[in-house]
Amino acid sequence: MLTERQELILKTIIMDFTQSHEPVGSKTVMNQLPVKVSSATVRNEMAALEEKGLLEKTHSSSGRIPSTAGYRYYLDHLINPVKIPASVYNRIIYQLDQPFQQVNEIVQEAAKILSDLTNYTAFAAGPETRSVKVTGFRIVPLSSHQVMAILVTDDGNVKNQIYTLPHHTNGEEIEKAVRLINDQLVGKPLSSVNEVLLKRIADHLVAGGSAPEILDLLQDVIKDAASEQMYVDGQINLLSNYESDDLAKVKSLYKLIDQNDAISSLIGFNPKDEIKNDSKSKVQVKLGSELQSDLLEDYSLLTAQYSVGKYGKGTIALLGPTNMPYSQMIGLLEYFRNELAKKLLDYYGRFK
């Protein structure tokens, strides 16, 4: 652990560096400290912090910058999230106050709002689908070989996909299959639609003389409805925060961000990783080396979970430079997760 004075100096350096992005010298620290300390004392304490691995010296300046370990100490012990200004509050309320038709529209807009407010890359995932129930399934013929499958759930979401059937399927055959499927599916949670239930539906379809391709169609649309959709906004902001001129690395970074499974794994929320100095905070911070990817060594990932009661939990996240202003970003995420949860609860209330 550090002494109280060392903690004060480390916090001062980090707060200055995350605003100016310039190495911080002892004179700057001395002028910003709330207590009077000599320049020599500040220099000695900065040297001690450097020996502990919490500060680093740059080649181009006599000033110091925080190391990854320094940021981690700050996040775990010293940070105080800042309340967002009224202008940001009003902007969030305004942008969330739209006539959304589906949950996914709200979640997608959440990613856009966060990216616009921060100029970072933002992620948003909707609440889990465990409690969502099927309210209807339809197949609409589009041509002699093409149909659209539509699945509706009790949270107002509608999933549809277009399929090409290998042979002509008449309308009567399709309607019969739809009735059989609805008899088995309606009222059941998406999470309960497993292989056993699908096998039972398949047996009914075969016994009724329906085309086996209809079961494949059903499986695809259910898989799509039950999968977690991760929305990403502000990918272009990665370039402004990326210090490498290596085009191949930039392409790899973009590819990583576009991989839904990789991102879902990356921002997987672990309550044990919430910042430790404030029990009320619900924001998790992972620094570059903690993200286990060479592509992200200069970035930090801030993740917050939001709860929509019985409808489950979702996640929002920000990916930005390691020298981001953490107190402001954490304050923003803490506020935004609550407003997003309120908006989703209002939306779900329409279907009671």
Curated annotation (Swiss-Prot):
In Gene Ontology terms, what is one molecular function of this protein? DNA binding
Q: Keyword Transcription regulation: yes or no? A: yes
Q: Which domain of life is it from?
A: Bacteria
Asked whether the UniProt record includes Transcription regulation among its keywords, one would answer yes
Keywords (alphabetical) are: Repressor, Stress response, Transcription, Transcription regulation
Q: Name one GO biological process term.
A: negative regulation of DNA-templated transcription
| Main function | Negative regulator of class I heat shock genes (grpE-dnaK-dnaJ and groELS operons). Prevents heat-shock induction of these operons.
Would you identify the family this protein belongs to, as annotated? Belongs to the HrcA family.
State the name under which the record lists this protein. Answer: Heat-inducible transcription repressor HrcA
Q: Which gene encodes it?
A: hrcA
